[in-house]
């Protein structure tokens, strides 16, 4: 379906809007597709899941729907970047999108609150910087597992994301050839 694949932000956006009917349909279609192709995993990737990581009650709802549909387990994976590099990258990206963000104020929020929260009339983003706090809280809320990867290992294995791809693809003959 073109609508489902139109943006890397579509799924997180629908979760944040509590469009659980869309999420259920998306998960159902992908589970059926995986079964039809005799695959053992459905891999969903988006850099925009960070808000769901911070607001873990959304992750719980996502898991509940997936498990109800027949997914056997949910394995969450997260790439953690050096916080200073992450902050500067986010600031540059948001500035390029004409976000009105004061550098000093944003840095203050990161240092004192462990997160950066930005909202507009129709969107809201929350970015975690206090990794220990948010990981602990996420793990307390979810029923699945969480694996974390350093940004450096994520980009330095010949192909960006190779470390994660090798975990998700469980066919030893094909994982290096991907």
Which positions does each model-derived feature cover?
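PAPS-dependent sulfotransferase catalytic core
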Residues: 1-42, 46-48
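Flexible, glycine- and charge-enriched loops at secondary-structure boundaries
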Residues: 16, 20, 55, 124
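PAPS-dependent sulfotransferase catalytic domain
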Residues: 48-50, 54, 63-177
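Aromatic-rich, lipid-facing transmembrane alpha helices and their immediate juxtamembrane interface loops
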Residues: 57-59
């Amino acid at each position: 379906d073109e609508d489902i694949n139109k943006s890397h932000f579509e799924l997180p956006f629908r979760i944040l809007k509590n469009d659980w009917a869309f999420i259920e349909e998306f998960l159902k279609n992908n589970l059926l597709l995986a079964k039809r192709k005799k695959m053992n995993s459905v891999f969903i990737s988006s850099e925009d899941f960070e808000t769901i990581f911070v607001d873990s009650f959304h992750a719980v709802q996502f898991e509940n729907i997936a498990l109800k549909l027949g997914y056997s387990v949910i394995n969450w994976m997260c790439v953690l970047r050096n916080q200073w590099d992450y902050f500067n990258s986010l600031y540059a990206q948001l500035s390029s999108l004409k976000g009105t963000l004061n550098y000093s104020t944003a840095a203050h929020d990161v240092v004192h609150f462990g997160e950066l929260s930005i909202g507009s009339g129709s969107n809201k983003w929350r970015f975690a910087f206090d990794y220990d706090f948010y990981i602990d809280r996420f793990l307390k809320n979810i029923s699945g597992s969480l694996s974390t990867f350093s940004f450096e290992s994520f980009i330095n294995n010949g192909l960006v994301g190779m470390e994660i791809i090798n975990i998700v693809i469980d066919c030893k003959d094909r994982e290096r050839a991907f």
